[in-house]
Amino acid sequence: MAYDVTGLWLESDLTADEEAFVSFYTSRTGTLTLVPGGTGGYYLLWITFRRPPTSREERERRDVEIQTVLAVLSPLLGYPHVIRRSPPRGSERVVSFGYGPNINHRPTTLSTELGVLLRELGLQEWARVEVGRHLVSKITQTLLEPHPPQFIRAFTQNTDLVPYEGLEVPEGPQPVARPHIEDDVIMQAVMISLGADLLPLAVQASTGDNYNVARYFVIPGRCTMERWPWNCARQAFGIHGAYTHVHSSVQRGIRGLGNLLFHSTLFPGGQTQGALTGLYATEPALGPRAHSRFRRIFAKGVQQAEMLQGAGVPTLGGFLKTVRTIATTPGNALAVCSISTTTSKECISLRRMIPQQTVVCLGRFEPTDGPDTYPNLYRDSSDNAVRILETLKLVQRLAKGPIFSGLNRSHDPAPVVRHLQALAPRTGLELFVSKLPDEVRAHLPADPAAGPDAVEAAVAEHFLNVYCSLVFAVVAESGAVPGDLGETPLEVLQRAARLCACQITVLGRTSEQPGIRIVDDLTGETTRVFSVDQPSSTPPSPWLALSDGVRVSGHPEDVDWGLFATGSTIHQLLRHATVGSKEFFTRHMDRCSNGLIAQQAGVGPLDIPVSDYHLVLHSSMLAERVAPRVPDTVEAITPSMANLLHKDFETWVKALPQELLPVPAWRGQAMAMGEQAYKMATNVSTGATYAITEALTNLMFSPVSKLQDVVLTGAVAWSPEDHQAGLLQECLFACKEFCRELGVALSISSAASSPTLSERHVRITQQQETVEVLPFNSVVFTSWAEVKGSRYRVTPDVKVEGNALVYLAVNQSCLIAGSTFEHNFLASRHPIPPLNPSTVASLFMLVKYLMSKRLIVSGHDIGDGGLLPSAIEMALAGCRGLQLSLPAHPNPLELMVSETPGALVEVPQVHLSEVLRAARDYRCVAHPLGTVGPEGQGNNVTILQNETVVFQETLTSLQVSWTSFSDEMWNLVTPPLHPLEDMHRKDLGRLEHHLGSLRAMCLGSQLRLFSCPTSPRRVAALVLPGSSAPYALMAALQNTGFEVATVTVEELKRGQSLSGFSGLITCLRTGCQASYASARGWVLALCNDPTCASTLTEFLNRPDTFSICCGEVGFQLLVALGVVGRSESSPYTYGPTPPQRWAVNLETNVSKLYDSHWLNIQIPQNTKSVFLRVLRGTVLPSWAQGEYLGVRYEQDALEYILRQRGEITLTYHGNAADETLPARHYPRNPTGNSTVAGLTSSDGRHAALIIDPSLMFHPWQWQHVPPDLTPLSMSPWAMAFQSIYLWSVKKINDHH
């Protein structure tokens, strides 16, 4: 096939890596010296067409297509103004250097997703689009070679990027060099059966009463869940009985969303409601590898969060632990991810599998051959995963009964062949070559005379032995299933896939003969090519039969505490990545987008991310709306009544009975993580029991009522070295016994080999250095429990001046062994003392007793860094000083850095004696340490011993140290800021709010609940393929009386009318890596489709309709349809406009990253917005989440025009409530430019908002409620949704 390649060079700013490179080599003596100010950057856009143009008309058409695509992709390319058709030329003193993805490799994930979008736009001749970079640098030396080695090392060494020599034309199908894929030895040893009559090690090492052995020891919880209607399924909203479960997995960089797909086959049709992530990484100490290690930590941590947010799953918290190594180690990273999924009870049933049933696969075939490396170009596509997950949800609604007889995936990491084997373990599969994906068939032998061996090799190399994010399923036998159309199970599945735009392929059928048979049916005769045995006929993993491991025993040496200065030691601990790393990652990941998150990591007035437990509720619906306890709680109204009510907002609420507290009524799930890799490096079994203890102490301040309610899910990362086998078995069974004695359930859900994270010198000579790899072993435990959302809980931020701070612990000893202090300051390892499970249980029960009596108001477990760093985190979170007095001890620093399991609790002085008495009753150690000081960052944390000050620092100084790792990460991955802007970079929190006349209502009232039975108001939630539904918006609208249903793009294309709807909302973002560019492409596709465009414009032009379009998708849709952001003021009708005429677009954040901040928002006094009119003049807090959180104007003075006309609905505001103080700087103004965060149409009916107001509908969704608004019984944002409902009902008579 003859391809045609076009390159475009688009002038842009330098990336953060390029800035660092230029800064390093500018005016530097040596073999490469860059001229100051002499380096420019370009994006290089590679466009590959399937064939060269054959006529002038075709070339002109391609030019038009290129301009359209550039307009769509312009945010991804930095809104370029200068575009070149040829590369910038180099000379003897000018380096012209291009680099990027390997064009001769398979397309990157970004390219694959863009390819799907381009086909949606009708650009069938476009084969591939890739984005690279190009630098032009003036140098002082004479250039001896085109690409100096310094450029190659800086931008392509140890990465998936390559230097470019020119516009290379790919030839034929893009090959992937695929080595023979070996099964992961740890996964096989732990998760796979050891023999015909033996259970897998993971099952043997698990314990619990209520369980089911389904691929592992599954311990589900019972709960309820929201079931949202799809327009195509004609079902009503409801709360249904459900199961919930937490699955934890080790992420080696192979198909990073395999855990979501695995869980979706275990609990089909479910909704993943939240995730926790952890990261182990090589410590980025000083040295030649420091920069690359930092980059790998950033890439791995952010990549995991980005994939989850693309799938609509908030990341609630997690950990980062770095491992010390020698300076020459390249560095590596290993991620752990735990996800919580809830599924309706009727969705988990399967039908009986018999021969001749259809085998299908869901999803795009996008194979990789091994772990992804920096910069993660071939990571999993969230867009593809969401299409699969949404199809599995929808098919359950369409069929109204089970249609699958097999739905299974192997434990990851595993190639396709393992997933097929897991699909039908007791029967056989017969797959046909003609049904294999196109890419596989493209690699089949072209010669018809090629024998079966050649076909077998091609199928094995390009299909069976690759990693791919597909879901394989066996569809039940023919016969109509319950439903509207009398379809067969396969037809129902195909319809669901079509509606969700999910690729579905019929591969073959089940058979009586065991094993997998690949049948070549492309020749005249049907010929069996080869078969693959089932796992049961293969020998079990021999790894566990290997010799016992080498146990690392501690070599205790007396610590000379006099060598360590207290102040500098504490500051070094705070600067360590393990202690102070959470801030950067927390501020740059989705924390709450589904509206179910009652506790994420950030707490206190400064949103300091120190909460170790996290809380996700199973519903954000008002209980009185769904299941009213009193008749007539939901009041029926008519349009005339709505008209009267709409005029007086004081009639929208009713007084809240004093005995009722403003707390969520639904149950939820509390989650926390625990790990102790440092301690396991000395003793794996004892260290793992400390990890279990940490998982429990992290969870104990949540609403969990008793220890027996807790379930632990374990993920094993283990060295595959032969001598580690015995240690693994010993460790897992020690964990089982420890959990049995505690009375908590344990399930091992995944296992994988650990990469090389650390090395040490064995021998160093002048000629060479000999190093050995240090084995890395860890078990990460995720603790979780079903809890009542109304139950009392506490957070780590100290609250009240004068309260006592009490130290609770399991014993009196100081624990330095395996601590962060030991890992970073001491050369020897101390032996790890064993833990007594009864004392751990006593500590847990003591804290629960104190909480049940409301004797404590804040609490924090003793975590990484020890006692004093934990106390400092509480002080930082509460923005209050501390004055503490240590008990008598010869080495006060030893007390401060001790990691003995325990907790710090804040106790009102009137309850102190009762708390100490309770501690004695529970046989726990309790020491009153001191008191909480006044509020203010200028106050001190002071530590005394025998009335002598041994440590004293201001909160400001401590926060500088605690955030130093985050600052280093920021400086590494973000563009440099002007010094005046950099001054404001940490200016967050301490928000003052102005509720105006709504204040009294919000402090003592609740919404009246209305409905209009005679003419229900319906809202369409338009969801793009590969995007998650806007569940928070849907719940907020349903709460105020609307009936909300999901509408797919496919329905619009097929002529689905919106005449039965009065409101429109959209998904907020797409699942693609370049979400905003993808959103623009989809919006253009909707505008280009005559049926979709006509349906949408007809709806928007109706005078009785409204829309609340939030986020990247919603904002751009209203812009593209000419609804908002227009300069003309005369009345006009809405309709599609080309992207070159879009007057406003979204602007990227200053950080160039996804941001998640709790900010002040002002609603202008003159806004025309029908939705937000009731909030005029107020200053309210809001979640601002996204990568593009500002408005960019393409016409001069347009913002002034819109502001004067009252078409601006929201603006970013400073921390003060004064309406004259808008936010000018990042992060209070995420883009640092226009303060606008929302627009409205000229008649006020349609709102295009950057933020999502539904994320603040309930008080429990707020990051922080200030004391002057406590207790907040109703969020003012809820009044906006009440307003739009009453407006919609009163407009009923306007719809003819």
Curated annotation (Swiss-Prot):
Pfam families, alphabetized: AIRS_C, FGAR-AT_PurM_N-like, GATase_5, Tegument_dsDNA
Ribosomal protein keyword on record: no
Source organism, top-level taxon: Viruses
GO biological process: intracellular transport of virus; purine nucleotide biosynthetic process
Annotated keywords: Virion, Virion tegument
A GO cellular component entry from the record: viral tegument
InterPro entries to which the protein is assigned, alphabetical: Class_I_gatase-like (IPR029062), FGAR-AT_PurM_N-like (IPR055181), Herpes_virus_tegument (IPR010077), PurM-like_C_dom (IPR010918), PurM-like_C_sf (IPR036676), PurM-like_N_sf (IPR036921), Tegument_herpes_virus_N (IPR024346)
Predominant location category: virion
MF annotations from Gene Ontology: phosphoribosylformylglycinamidine synthase activity
Location in or out of the cell: Virion tegument
Protein name in the entry: Protein ORF75
Organism this protein belongs to: Human herpesvirus 8 type P (isolate GK18) (HHV-8)
Gene it is expressed from: ORF75
